[in-house]
Amino acid sequence: MLIKKNIINEPLMKKQSNGSKWNGIFYSLSFCLFLLFFSFNTISAQDTSNSKSWKDKIISWKILKKPFDFLQSSNIKQPTAEMSIPVGFTDIEELIRDLQLAGKIAPNNALTIRPLYTNSDITYNKLLNIIDADIENNNQLVSKPNLNISLLPINFTQKLTTHHPYGWNDGAFSLSKGYQFLIGGGVYLQWHKLKIQLRPEFVKTASGNYETSGYWGAVTPSFKKIMPGQSSIRYDLGPLTVAASTENMWWGPGIYNSMLMSNNAPGFLHYSINSNRPINTFAGSFQFQLQAGFLQKDSTQGYENKRLYPAIINNGKRYYNSINVSYQPKFLKNVYFGLTRTFQNYTRLQSSNSNGFVYNYVPVFVAFFKNTYSDDTVKRDQVAAVSARWILPKEKAEMYFEFGFNDAKQNFRDLMMDMAHSSGYVWGFKKLKYINETKYLNFNIEMARLAQTTRYLHRNAGNWYEHSGVIEGYTNLNQIMGGVSGFGNNMQALAVSYHSGWNKLGFIFQHIVQNPYDLVAGINEVGIRSIKWTDYSFGLQTRYHYKKILLSANMEVIKAKNYIWKKDNNPTNLFFYINTIYLW
């Protein structure tokens, strides 16, 4: 956020105490011991007999030997996690979600930590065969007990806008007007527990002229480049995986929006440790991902909004640390709870303070409230969110929400008294209505609020993804990594579609209110823009497969009312997004 004001009579922030330092270290050690504990139980479980000791009965760790259990069916075996389903292959991800709601795959994966992974027995071919029996994919080059080499599907993605930039969840594409395309593909190699996926992407962007304002938009040069894309190197350690990756990620239950991690921006190099399967315990099952990496900016490209432009030239690297934990209670079979927390700060400041390793490099383990550390004096940004997803098997439906804060609370009193400050949310509902075994109707609705609330009249928080401590905001290569509808925007989406295997025909309506609150010239006395920019989008969505070609297309007509907040400036924008997957 750009302006921070303490609540009236808010006590001054306390200096960091030695006890506070030990709290962060304690949290980190506890987490590491937890990982070692269930890893030990996994290894020892392989040598135990059928009889359980008192320890097994009390703790009853049942680490899933089948990492892709959520894709299980009565006649399919699940081995170790391997090839990824890239975030961006939204059609395959959507169909996996539909199969889970329909009860055709097990509900023990929250689907809130992606990318998802196939494996040696459930290959792309078998997964696609579950989706549609007519789809074939023969991608294996070498298949031996300890060696697997496979070709990855080739995807050719195209995007076109006719008036101004529009669209989201498009990875390496730039925020520009005109025609863009991306080609991706590669090879996957598995040797024992080592898994290497090389999936580079070639992208060519556009540079069409369009009407901008001093506040929104920027016409920037086009570029063409080869990027690492959806590549990774992974090594399995029982139920854990350590990895280096440039893959896009998606955290949270949303279909169109994720508050903290989506493929709205290009992926970035990160190092992670994560569970490679749902981990069953006496209290329920857990999944997690802990990661760290560096975010980048591109001096040749613009930002969506002037509030994200670096106001000060800063050549320091931005260090990024985040964690996502998903929990499915033992007593609530179809309910999933999630917690996500992220930090970013400049590396040149890490060595200039004496707060210790945990505070500087794994701050996701420090206390949640800011009165433990003097965060407002440190150039860094933290964001946190909680989520829930509830599957209704009999209704073949689900409800979900994500609620978060763009700024950490001062203390528990601050949390209780000013819940709306810096808050945002995503919530949605999805329902399937089956016509027969393979044909069904899909209904889904999703709403997101990322503009700050009217509480800013008392205590300005700025919109989501901006912060005075990190001048580039929550971005990578100048694009927001979280919510997709735009900076400070509110969004509602409604979709209805007919499905038959892979094939799909549907309609989507989206309503976007562009940054309705802001402290800029021209607003009225209560801080609400006198002229509101609103987009109304009407679209056709379709999927079709022919032999080894999987085609999906999204075509929308967007009517912008008061574009760039200019009265009676109402252009029409056409948007086309076509993704073609070539199988082997």
Would you name each region that the model predicts?
Residues L2-I3, K14, T42-K177, Y188-H192:
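N-terminal periplasmic/intermembrane-space "pro-region" immediately following the signal or transit peptide
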Residues M1-S49, W584:
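Bacterial Sec-dependent N-terminal signal peptides
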Residues A45, I226, Q328, K333-W584:
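Exposed, low-structure sequence patches enriched in small/polar residues
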Residues S143-K177, K204-M227, S262-N264, I279-S285, ...:
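Primarily recognizes Gram-negative and organellar outer-membrane beta-barrels
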Residues G184, W191-L198:
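Core alpha-helical transmembrane segments of integral membrane proteins
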Residues A106, S143-P145, L189-K193, D236-P239, ...:
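Short loop/turn motifs that connect adjacent beta-strands in outer-membrane beta-barrel proteins
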